[in-house]
Amino acid sequence: MKTEIICVGTELLVGDIVNTNAQYISAKFTNIGIDLYYQTTVGDNYGRLKECLENAFKRVDLVITTGGLGPTVDDITKEVVADYFGEELEVIERYYDLIVKKYNERGFGEVASGGRKESSILKNSKLLENEVGLAPGFFYEKDNKKIIVLPGPPREMTWMVDNQVLPLLKQYSNDVLLMKTLEIKGVPEGRIDDRLKDYFEMSNPTVAPYAKEGCVHVRIAMKGDRGSSDYLTAEIDKIADEIKEIYPQAMEIKEDC
């Protein structure tokens, strides 16, 4: 399943905040064998966001968006998605009740008009619960186009990816991607590239070098269905052993996602 991430927010484009959402989603999707092909960042602009959706669905099957689900006028993601698919929005009343409760607890008085907007999702979509925030997400599918819409705050996004999105996507993908990384010190990247060229031209498994400060990481990855994990592991180990024979100083390391 070809996938694109669209991160929405002018604050991302002007450098006010670092886009950690794309990194987190990419790592999690890789672990379950979802093919991530593109990442796009767009500001809070209706026309440009709609154009991003149009372009994305010309080249991928699944789009996941983060950001733009709040109560203010520049939070436009849900409206643009509704426009693109020709659907309406509907309020999830229990999420609106949460907003009312928050206002009352903080003595803010009557809920602002954007409260109902924040608590809405696309009609005919699957609700994605948000247990650490006020804006729900949703999953929508039409004409073989799938979209997952998530809030932008990293704390909310990460909880929803782990507890809502990954279990959902595992229904659509039986693939798994296994990886092993070797660290090689004392050899320039260019020389490693020459020596391991035949490995780097492989397709599955894939072998790729990544220059790090003072060393080079060589990542071996192989994709297959979940029932073939033992086979995948054996193939990866075989290549790792071959590379260790060429570079005895190569050490296996764990890279955090």
Task: Describe each region flagged by the PLM.
Residues 1-39:
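Glycine-rich phosphate/diphosphate-binding loop of Rossmann-like nucleotide-binding domains
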Residues 8-10, 65-73, 151-152, 223:
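Glycine-rich beta-strand-to-loop/alpha-helix junction loops that act as flexible
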Residues 38-48:
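Short beta->alpha junction loops
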Residues 48-51, 58, 76-172:
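Proline/glycine-rich low-complexity loops and linkers
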Residues 54-65:
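Short, structured active-site "lid" loops
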Residues 66-88, 231, 248-253:
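Flexible gly/pro-rich beta->alpha loop and the following alpha-helix that scaffold active-site loops
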Residues 117, 231, 235, 244-257:
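Short alpha-helical segments enriched in small residues
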Residues 140-221, 231-236, 240, 246:
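Accessory alpha-helical/coil subdomains and C-terminal extensions
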